[in-house]
Regions:
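Residues on the lipid-exposed face of transmembrane beta-strands in outer-membrane beta-barrel proteins
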Residues: 40-44, 82-90, 102-104, 137-147, ...
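Predominantly the C-terminal beta-signal and adjacent terminal strand-loop region
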Residues: 179, 189-246
Length: 246
């Protein structure tokens, strides 16, 4: 993942350096003077869940007996997804813009559980898997600071907040996430003025606990409880590469 990020940043930097060697004719010279404009966005993202495991805990089984469990849960890889949306951008002054970008984020998370209280035939903890489908509807609010335009490119940095609503969830899953989350976004990108193409790489970190603790009380199959109680909190993380077209 780090290698992928560094490669993307290197390509963007090299492209800017090459195009900045000499002055050229500017395409769409007045496009940044518009007070407001619309656009569309498509992209890919990589998502992860950062769990805090509960450790040794107890639960009541189907027969009413109290039992102990010690199960760990982890999303042991960054899972890819895709993003589609629209945007509206307001020009504040020659360097600052304010962007509102409603979007949909689709993906799948792969969770791995290890039951430390139960062993398989060769002495390893029993392993269970969960495939968690995710579909988020979001509306990002971003403040953009752009450098002075040079030729047909203009690098910028951005930051903002992105509230999301989780549209997915299955009552047969071990782990379930809350219906709403709030993300902090920080990133960088560059405007290209062939037809106002804007690639942007940003990092998103969940500011709220996304783990639905109330789901424990709704589990009907009591044999799932050791796995449902494996985590006490979870925070979502994403790395998003998005292309804006205006």
């Amino acid at each position: 993942m780090k290698r992928l990020i560094m490669t993307i940043l290197a390509v963007m930097t090299i492209s800017i350096v090459i195009m900045a060697q000499e002055r050229t004719v500017e395409n769409r010279p007045y496009t940044d003077l518009r007070p407001f404009h619309f656009g569309v966005m498509v992209g890919t993202h990589f998502q992860d869940l950062e769990f805090t495991n509960t450790g040794l805990t107890s639960y009541i089984d189907a027969d009413g007996n109290e039992k102990e469990s010690n199960v760990t849960v982890d999303q042991d890889r960054w899972d890819a997804g895709f993003t589609v949306g629209v945007l509206g951008e307001f020009r504040l002054n020659s360097h600052f813009q304010f962007r509102i970008a409603p979007a949909m984020y689709f993906g799948t998370r792969h969770l791995t559980f290890h039951n430390l209280m139960e062993k398989d035939g060769i002495g390893n903890p029993i392993e269970e898997k969960q495939e968690m489908k995710t579909a988020y509807i979001s509306s990002a609010f971003n403040l953009i600071f752009g450098a002075q335009r040079f030729n047909n490119h203009r690098p910028y940095i951005m930051a903002g907040l992105n509230p999301m609503i989780n549209l997915s969830g299955n009552n047969d899953d071990y782990i379930k996430l809350k219906k709403s989350e709030m993300f902090l976004e920080i990133g960088a990108g560059c405007d290209f003025y062939l037809f106002k193409l804007r690639p942007e790489l940003k990092f998103m970190y969940g500011l709220t606990d996304s783990y639905d603790k109330n789901y424990i009380n709704k589990v009907k199959d009591k044999s799932m409880l050791p796995y449902t109680k494996a985590a006490k909190s979870a925070h979502s993380k994403m790395i998003a590469l998005t292309f804006y077209f205006e």
